[in-house]
Swiss-Prot record:
Its main location: secreted. The lineage of its organism: Eukaryota, Metazoa, Chordata, Craniata, Vertebrata. The modification Phosphoserine is found at S72. PROSITE patterns: TRANSTHYRETIN_1, TRANSTHYRETIN_2. The gene is TTR. Gene3D superfamilies: Transthyretin/hydroxyisourate hydrolase domain. GO terms for molecular function: hormone activity; identical protein binding; molecular sequestering activity; thyroid hormone binding. One of its GO terms (cellular component) is extracellular space. This is Transthyretin. It comes from Ovis aries. Belongs to the transthyretin family. It is found in: Secreted.
Amino acid sequence: MASFRLLLLCLAGLVFVSEASPAGAGESKCPLMVKVLDAVRGSPAANVGVKVFKKAADETWEPFASGKTSDSGELHGLTTEDKFVEGLYKVELDTKSYWKSLGISPFHEYAEVVFTANDSGLRHYTIAALLSPYSYSTTALVSSPKE
């Protein structure tokens, strides 16, 4: 239990530090950002495949956006404020491919976060994930858009 609390504390610190540093002009307009950390190596998780889906009226998940995390473990520019409308979204991280590329056999095929966005007006979302081969933890930072 103490290890789990420590992981959550580290993840919360990651989000706090990343949000405390000034964002570039392009980042301030990014309504959905993903940040991934490798808990084993204590570093950003680069080249993690990310898929975003939006729940359609017929209850199916439609592809919405995709990309890979940068060397800093971040993925910006997934969508625009105009396209990121109110709805139910799913962010899927390809954790299996990430760990396999490091020569590690993981337990999970992927990690996913399902959330409702913009139900109280336009917001910006940072989805942060802390990965290990046999577990993952996620948190989110939801903020008002910066002018």
